Amino acid sequence: HKDNLWFATWDGINRFNGYTFKTYKARQGNYISLTNNRVDRMYEDRYGFLWLLTYDNRVHRFDPKTETFEQVPAAGEEGSAFNVHTIEVMPNGTVWLLTENDGAIRILTHPDENNRLTWDIYSSKTELFPSLHVFKVHQDKAGNDWLLTDNGLGMIHPGKKEPDSYFTETKGKFGGMNQAFYAVQERDKDICFASDHGRIWSYQKESGEFTLIELPTKGQITSIHPIAPDVSVITTDSDGFFTYNLRTKTNVHYSFLTCKALPAKPILSAYVDRSSEVWFEQEEPGVVAHFNPSTGVVTREQIPI
């Protein structure tokens, strides 16, 4: 960041300019307005501001130019007491704050107005979107913001405030039709959204229609990662993982029962390396499962601990 390294620590944030460190933290009598000095997450937006998530689930924007902090939303404003668990920074500069039980807050920066902030709360309480739990936000290549929630999908067009809703349930309408969505993968012509019971809904960009992909599992799909132009690796919370060919619509299932090298524990995350090989994080101390798509072999890597 402009020849500086920034570090989020349990005692404020630190800037290293190549020679010395400078610490920014709230002390008695100083001007720094951090509500908690333990900073668990830090992100940079396209305007050069740093967004900090502190231990007390509050969010602060830091301006490196003026070396000032501001709480977002501002203290006393609606949303300032929400417990935020995730900050998601979009490519266009929009920042989303995902809360524990109050939906999501969309923060807009106005660079032509001295970087003034405005925000809207998307939740069933404000009636902007019928959900209290937003799991993820994805900005597609056309600039639309997609909300993946426990009650369907929302799509907000660029420059708009009101979202289009898909697979949502409202009172007295479409009872039981709502679905939760947890993960997303975008390609040139479609966007795949992962749901429960092995369902993936593929949004066709040209027609605006959804088509259903069903995998033979009752598990919740937790992530989708491309490993080849038409092939993805798809993880579940309780039933291992799949490889799926989007062109031929065929899949291969690697479960705990049929693949002995795969620990019988939930897959927490997956990482695809430069060789398109996949590494799985699971609830198994000292163990990493490794998948080679070229050979179809899963190996169990033991880390000395």
Tell me what each language-model feature is.
Residues 1-305:
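Carboxylate-rich, polar loop motifs that coordinate divalent cations or form catalytic acidic clusters
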